[in-house]
Amino acid sequence: MAEHRDKKPGSRRAYLKDFKGYVHSDGYAGYNKLTGIVRVGCWAHIRRKFVEAVPAKKSPGAPLTAAEIGRDYCDKLFYIEDGLKSLSPEERCRKRLELEKPVLDAFWCWLESLAVLNGSALGKAVTYARNQRPYMENYLLDGRCSISNNAAENAIRPFTVGRKNWLFADTPKGA
């Protein structure tokens, strides 16, 4: 998907025309219109939003902020997931339901209990998580799915960084 210059749904549909299955993605809504696709959300994106909302300064011994609690829920999921790496996809699927589903249920319950200011960093994190909820548990459906799309993003990073560097190169050799 990284080869497309635009995020128009038509370009995604043309690229994925006969594909049926799971697509790991960030919060881009264009994937929602594709038929035969199960969108798998990225917990690293939700975690990042909560990290961005953590206050820069906090008194020693102060209770955890809501942003820290949100980040900690995400960290717990990643910690559990790390322990499941060596399992077969079938066993990973079973263990996720056993170990991660209760954490997810607690996270969503906690998230719904929050009242936040929409424009604040915490408000943005909470709104993003709430909006992505329909896709965030889809990784539980198949042990081959990942909890994040970090691997894909790391694979395309050289091209996304290079895109600006190559902007004024007139030939591939000049780039």
Predicted regions: what is each one?
Residues 1-175:
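Catalytic center-proximal scaffold of phosphoryl-transfer enzymes
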